[in-house]
């Protein structure tokens, strides 16, 4: 597998790549991953990997071949291009030393990872199967990144290069299909492989976790967990916090916009920005909140579906989604029955939804309870990995070793 993001990264694509590779290893396969240096979501290389050019390590039975790359602390089109370029160049200059594989899978993004995987598969003459987690061409156009128009054109060409060379293409949501087809991919080659909930169920009493976090028993707490990037449009939460000092808003995580958000919220005492929770405490923190928020800019339609949603649903708390009604994120919230939708970039509407849930505890609990039911029925780890297995088996023509 080629995946720039991999363990110990705990957010975004990394956990999915890790669980797939570890699943392969646990079932007796010799699993190798060409990965970057751990840097997400902080967009800062973790201390133990700083200054490391290349490293090969064994993690849970998986051989991980790491290659250094640039890590832009602030996202612009040029810096993103340098990031992708460094991944591509280092991957080409120092491909993993390993036996010929049966198949090459890529997690996309990164774009460079997809291109590298396509080239490795061609060199080894084995099937190539990319799994599209985000559409970077659409992301550049829709996220508001500086220089986005030129970046969108470049990213679209790189995506098309990789995807048109695939044996099969996995997409995590049906809203991606039309764009993938527009890149020249045969619709008959596209398979739906939704992500799954990769976190455990909460285990601690909510009151205990709230006390530990300093959240008062009667206070309404709205929590956003995950990446603080451009496409999230987290300014809407800062705006909502300004409107009602009695409601506590918590942004938990890291990302390229963290410093800007901290500056924007410097005079908002009821908004806290806290570091990511440890993996073993993460589910309990989500469950301790009254409302879980997912936000996106209004322009974000078909470029991504936040991986945080699967974790939110597992936590058993109601979701307020400030997203475009016609996008994939809204579809998933509707499908789950575990939340409510409000217009994107509208602090007043978001706050009104939060107040409505706070004023109807039974209704809020009913919405929240729908989340774990949806996970059990559709988003379990076992079901997700079975879909990946089926994708691999089909690409190998039923001749999986």
Tell where the protein language model's regions lie, with residue ranges.
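A short helix/loop element that forms part of the nucleotide-sugar donor recognition site in Leloir-type
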Residues: 49-54, 202-215
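N-terminal subdomain of nucleotide-sugar transferases
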Residues: 1-52, 56-57, 239-242, 400-401
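Carbohydrate-associated surface elements
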Residues: 37, 175, 196
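Nucleotide-activated donor-binding/catalytic signature segment of Leloir-type glycosyltransferases, i.e.
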Residues: 247-250, 259-283
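Conserved donor-binding/catalytic core segment of Leloir-type glycosyltransferases
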Residues: 216-232, 238-242, 250
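Membrane-proximal helix-turn-helix segments that form the acceptor-binding/catalytic region
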Residues: 115, 119-123, 149-169
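Nucleotide-sugar-dependent
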Residues: 232, 276-287, 292-313, 319-331
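A short, well-ordered alpha-helix in the C-terminal region of glycosyltransferases
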Residues: 349, 356, 363-378
């Amino acid at each position: 597998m080629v995946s720039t993001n991999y363990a110990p990264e705990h957010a975004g694509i990394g956990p999915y790549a890790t669980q797939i590779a570890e699943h392969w290893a646990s079932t007796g396969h010799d699993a190798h991953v060409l990965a970057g240096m751990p840097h997400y979501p902080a967009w800062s290389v973790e201390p133990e990997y700083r200054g490391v050019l290349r490293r090969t390590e064994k993690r849970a039975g998986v051989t991980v071949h790491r290659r250094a790359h640039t890590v832009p602390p602030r996202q612009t089109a040029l810096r993103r291009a340098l990031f992708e370029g460094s991944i591509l160049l280092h991957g080409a200059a120092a491909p993993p030393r390993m036996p010929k594989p049966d198949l090459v899978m890529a997690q996309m993004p990164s774009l460079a990872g997809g291109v590298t995987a396509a080239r490795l598969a061609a060199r080894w003459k084995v099937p190539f199967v990319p799994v599209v987690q985000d559409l970077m061409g659409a992301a550049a156009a829709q996220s508001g990144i500086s220089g986005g128009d030129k970046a969108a054109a470049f990213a679209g060409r790189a995506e098309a290069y990789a995807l048109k060379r695939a044996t099969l293409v996995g997409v995590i949501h049906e809203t991606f299909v039309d764009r993938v087809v527009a890149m020249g991919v045969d619709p008959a080659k596209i398979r739906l492989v939704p992500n799954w909930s990769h976190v455990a169920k909460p285990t601690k009493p909510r009151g205990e976790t709230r006390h530990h976090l300093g959240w008062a028993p009667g206070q309404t707490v709205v929590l956003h967990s995950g990446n603080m990037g451009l496409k999230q449009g987290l300014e809407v939460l800062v705006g909502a916090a300004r409107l009602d000092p009695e409601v506590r808003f918590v942004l938990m995580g890291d990302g390229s916009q963290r410093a800007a958000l901290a500056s924007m919220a410097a005079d908002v005492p009821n908004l806290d920005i806290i570091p990511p929770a440890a993996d073993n405490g993460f589910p309990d923190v989500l469950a301790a909140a009254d409302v879980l928020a997912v936000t996106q800019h209004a322009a974000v339609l078909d470029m991504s579906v936040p991986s945080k949603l699967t974790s939110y649903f597992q936590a058993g708390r109601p979701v307020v989604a400030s997203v475009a009604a016609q996008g994939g994120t809204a579809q998933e919230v509707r499908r789950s029955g575990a939340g409510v939708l409000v217009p994107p970039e509208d602090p007043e509407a978001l706050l009104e939804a939060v107040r409505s849930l706070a004023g109807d505890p039974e209704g809020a609990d009913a919405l929240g309870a729908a989340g774990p039911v949806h996970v059990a029925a559709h988003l379990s780890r076992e079901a997700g990995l079975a879909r990946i297995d089926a994708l691999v088996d089909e690409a190998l023509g039923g001749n999986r070793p």
